[in-house]
Amino acid sequence: MSPSDVPINWKRNLTVTWLGCFLTGAAFSLVMPFLPLYVEQLGVTGHSALNMWSGLVFSITFLFSAIASPFWGGLADRKGRKIMLLRSALGMAIVMLLMGMAQNIWQFLILRALLGLLGGFIPNANALIATQVPRHKSGWALGTLSTGGVSGALLGPLAGGLLADHYGLRPVFFITASVLFICFLLTFFFIHENFLPVSKKEMLHVREVVASLKNPRLVLSLFVTTLIIQVATGSIAPILTLYVRELAGNVSNIAFISGMIASVPGVAALLSAPRLGKLGDRIGPEKILIVALIISVLLLIPMSFVQTPWQLALLRFLLGAADGALLPAVQTLLVYNSTNQIAGRIFSYNQSFRDIGNVTGPLMGAAISASYGFRAVFCVTAGVVLFNAIYSWNSLRRRRLAIE
């Protein structure tokens, strides 16, 4: 029996990759609460300079990730997804360790860029599971896997803030590096993949990848959908705390209220993603995607008219429940419309679009709020998501007509 014929325990792989995504999500978000404080500790002074450098060290990771993702995706299709998971976890662990030793802002900026270059654990985990799980369970499996990163991202800032208060800023980077090394060990010992390496000559070029797709136009529309989902999420991030303060008035626990309102969509997505993924397996992920986008529009508009923080919290919880269906539905449709041979590259291209959205979303939100106020951000974001819903519906309708 050849290695590729050995049966894979995909359920165990799903469990271990979920843990890996949880640890990676936690590791990335552990340092987020105090990133501007660390920038200040590295010698940056003055309000405008601190804002500029904080924005740079935050966004440069996503920019370099967007650039590097297609390369790593191609390598994953040649060498296998497990080795890419190991490369990512170990590489990020080393970079996090070095971040704790940075002596000036330029060193830190370069290391943040390197973190983006070496990242990619979660998209490779998605590609691994997508190629192993039975197709009729893709929605449930990818929805479940998405909750790993969400859970880690929710707990990370809380843990990072507590650790920074007790031990200082630099030790948190060392703790984060340890968490990522644990992720490396879990992947090394417990994830199994039957993969026959492909020579560079046998690899499909970009044109051949596009030609091998069942519906290239639909796949491109799914990439655009991923970008817009991240733009919509990120556009609200820069103004959320300030908007909550405007709604709450002069209260002493504004940080707690803002933190809670920031986290409730993640909690809702955690609860909804596996269930909506399973529903998508039954009725079709395209229906879940369109309905979730329309619900998102209907929830974003009233956010610009709320009068209290609790009204905003309720709407954001409902929005999170809808958002929990979006990326897993996109990923499931990508699985349906591509082959295992090119899964690594398809998921890495999708990650690049996601990273671009992570950069442009906050910039859009900040620009709109500066010109038209906080409430306008929600209306414009609703308009962007509505465009996405119409665009996605049209792309999916064309696919259905082509099949008929």
From Swiss-Prot:
<comment type="similarity">
    <text>Belongs to the major facilitator superfamily. DHA1 family. MdtG (TC 2.A.1.2.20) subfamily.</text>
</comment>
<dbReference type="Pfam" id="PF07690">
    <property type="entry name" value="MFS_1"/>
</dbReference>
<feature type="transmembrane region" description="Helical">
    <location>
        <begin position="288"/>
        <end position="308"/>
    </location>
</feature>
<dbReference type="InterPro" id="IPR020846">
    <property type="entry name" value="MFS_dom"/>
</dbReference>
<feature type="transmembrane region" description="Helical">
    <location>
        <begin position="56"/>
        <end position="76"/>
    </location>
</feature>
<feature type="transmembrane region" description="Helical">
    <location>
        <begin position="222"/>
        <end position="242"/>
    </location>
</feature>
<keyword id="KW-0812">Transmembrane</keyword>
<dbReference type="GO" id="GO:0005886">
    <property type="term" value="C:plasma membrane"/>
</dbReference>
<dbReference type="InterPro" id="IPR011701">
    <property type="entry name" value="MFS"/>
</dbReference>
<dbReference type="InterPro" id="IPR001958">
    <property type="entry name" value="Tet-R_TetA/multi-R_MdtG-like"/>
</dbReference>
<feature type="transmembrane region" description="Helical">
    <location>
        <begin position="113"/>
        <end position="133"/>
    </location>
</feature>
<dbReference type="InterPro" id="IPR050497">
    <property type="entry name" value="MFS_MdtG_subfamily"/>
</dbReference>
<feature type="transmembrane region" description="Helical">
    <location>
        <begin position="317"/>
        <end position="337"/>
    </location>
</feature>
<dbReference type="Pfam" id="PF00083">
    <property type="entry name" value="Sugar_tr"/>
</dbReference>
<keyword id="KW-1003">Cell membrane</keyword>
<dbReference type="InterPro" id="IPR036259">
    <property type="entry name" value="MFS_trans_sf"/>
</dbReference>
<dbReference type="GO" id="GO:0022857">
    <property type="term" value="F:transmembrane transporter activity"/>
</dbReference>
<feature type="transmembrane region" description="Helical">
    <location>
        <begin position="171"/>
        <end position="191"/>
    </location>
</feature>
<feature type="transmembrane region" description="Helical">
    <location>
        <begin position="19"/>
        <end position="39"/>
    </location>
</feature>
<feature type="transmembrane region" description="Helical">
    <location>
        <begin position="376"/>
        <end position="396"/>
    </location>
</feature>
<dbReference type="InterPro" id="IPR005828">
    <property type="entry name" value="MFS_sugar_transport-like"/>
</dbReference>
<protein>
    <recommendedName>
        <fullName>Multidrug resistance protein MdtG</fullName>
    </recommendedName>
</protein>
<feature type="transmembrane region" description="Helical">
    <location>
        <begin position="144"/>
        <end position="164"/>
    </location>
</feature>
<keyword id="KW-1133">Transmembrane helix</keyword>
<keyword id="KW-0997">Cell inner membrane</keyword>
<feature type="transmembrane region" description="Helical">
    <location>
        <begin position="254"/>
        <end position="274"/>
    </location>
</feature>
<feature type="transmembrane region" description="Helical">
    <location>
        <begin position="90"/>
        <end position="110"/>
    </location>
</feature>
<keyword id="KW-0472">Membrane</keyword>
<keyword id="KW-0813">Transport</keyword>
<dbReference type="InterPro" id="IPR023692">
    <property type="entry name" value="Mutidrug-R_MdtG"/>
</dbReference>
